[in-house]
């Protein structure tokens, strides 16, 4: 983490501004004097203010954080003044007269950054023009001067430090915001130094027990680990010196959050982690990086599955480094990162590196890297002009800032950065609108893949096109999974808007009629509310907009429900569930044969389905001979069976499903979704269409996260039916995950 300096505290325990400024490492005397004047101005403006101490110290913290990034003097002055401006102690107009336009513009840009919260707050709601304008201003401020973003990140770190001793709910609130918003933003901009501190503080507040456990493990083995790394580094230095490779070699600290995340992701214990012992090699030149890699792999056996060359294939945020894991002395794993000095600075500072090298001979290279990092933002500003739906614009910003990324290759080897979960059509529309419109197929590594294929990291994709554009309206259906990005959907919407207006009107009428019939509302009644709501003069304009995809159907339906006092979501769900449970479905060719399980070697011994895992036909099964209750039939992957096997392996018997049995089996399916009106109705409609009996439903809502969790006990006849049902449930709008519970 970034350490808080104490050099500015004198012997009497008082703040000494001269010592403080000297501790910041500012080389220009003029800049030091300028910062001293700004500090004096802050003292003057906060005199008598009840929160003077808090505001001043927050500014000091922000300046210290930013000084580790070697930010320029205007950035440091803006950081020192920002807490005062944000608390309305002094207005921007007054500041402009006192400290100048350039510093105030930075402060104004930092205040515009508050709009980033609306990207999370409005994810499932309708959006106002004011919210969209706020986000547009934020994007423009970020592109115009990226220092405002870095200042905002420093302000959030300062806040996390402040709440260390605050009540738990205050710490958790601050940590959740930074986890959801600011840490992903720091990562997207490549500012590793700030990203790690944000993540470690958030992890400490949100998971205090896990944080303390890992911190304790690191501390307990610190001396042994440091001694091991010292010897390992000494050997590498000697070998590279002998080969004439110029590079620094040193052990590097591990961040607690990254350790925990890897333990969770790979289901590893602390002792099984590769990178608790970590070394970094920082070389002078690129060729020295690969020479160093050769030396490492010559003297130590490497693990091929843990090798990544991010120099040849940089991460979407511009990160470059070679990662390898080797078996060191004693068979202990050591993770090694190899990079040039420029790559190291870029990895730690990200966009902030541009300001460090803005002046002088290095400016050109730094500027190029800076431009690469904000290219996605410039595209966002250009794309927003094409997006008629303001909600789509916000969706695209959310995707670019918060979503995980995947990078793939064109046939020529160019890297394309897309949101994780993107499809071949998303790729095609990213390349060019015309490529997407004319797309009829795609190949990954020379193999044809379906349009619903989710692109994987490193895929090389080729788009197959026809002469004439012919996109399908089905591509806009979110349940089918053809197009997942707002960028792609916007391009398709635009194409249909330009086509025959009559076709859009007919399609819109069909869509609207279906929804109105379901709601029990006539078209004339709906017109009176919809025309003014969407600023249309006649119904044909409205229908054309619906058919062309310009109006979001779920928002329109929610609006009509509120206008006509239709049943609440709870009432609709209860009615749908009651109607479904009144029906009982059975397979048409149900067998009367009760030989549901064949257990090898035990004849017709009584058997029953184990409640712990509730296997169904299609699951691989195993029998366990109980005492007095015959044979219990378990799924082969049942955790309880594994326990039984370890204690009494002689009681385990092979079992298979009988060919003629078709009775129903009960199990529990859990659906997690964004809470919305009509969610349970949509889910139960699918179950009814699939003729699945619902035996019970339990649901709960998380109002803070706006999530609904629904556990349904259903009767299923085989694994194929279950797979089909889960597939359709996962395609319901707003459903995040639908799966069979492990114990069912």
UniProtKB/Swiss-Prot annotation:
The keyword Acetylation does not apply. Its EC number is 2.7.6.5. It holds the Pfam family ACT_4. Keywords: ATP-binding, GTP-binding, Kinase, Nucleotide-binding, Transferase. Residues 404-465 form the TGS domain. GO terms for molecular function: ATP binding; GTP binding; GTP diphosphokinase activity; guanosine-3',5'-bis(diphosphate) 3'-diphosphatase activity; kinase activity. Residues 55-160 form the HD domain. GO terms for biological process: guanosine tetraphosphate biosynthetic process; guanosine tetraphosphate metabolic process; nucleobase-containing small molecule interconversion; response to starvation. The keyword NADP does not apply. Disruption phenotype: A slight increase in biofilm formation in a csrA-disrupted background; when combined with a spoT disruption (a ppGpp0 mutant) there is a very large increase in biofilm formation. The ppGpp0 mutant makes decreased levels of CsrA and its inhibitory small RNAs (sRNA) CsrB and CsrC. Deletion of relA alone decreases persister cell formation in a hipA7 mutant; the double relA/spoT deletion obviates persister cell formation. It catalyses: GTP + ATP = guanosine 3'-diphosphate 5'-triphosphate + AMP. Residues 668-743 form the ACT domain. InterPro entries: ACT-like_dom_sf, ACT_dom, Beta-grasp_dom_sf, HD_domain, NT_sf, RelA/Spo_fam, RelA/SpoT_AH_RIS, RelA_SpoT. It comes from the Bacteria. SUPFAM superfamilies: ACT-like, HD-domain/PDEase-like, Nucleotidyltransferase, TGS-like. Pathway: Purine metabolism; ppGpp biosynthesis; ppGpp from GTP: step 1/2. In eubacteria ppGpp (guanosine 3'-diphosphate 5'-diphosphate) is a mediator of the stringent response which coordinates a variety of cellular activities in response to changes in nutritional abundance. This enzyme catalyzes the formation of pppGpp which is then hydrolyzed to form ppGpp. The second messengers ppGpp and c-di-GMP together control biofilm formation in response to translational stress; ppGpp represses biofilm formation while c-di-GMP induces it. Belongs to the RelA/SpoT family. This is GTP pyrophosphokinase. The gene is relA.
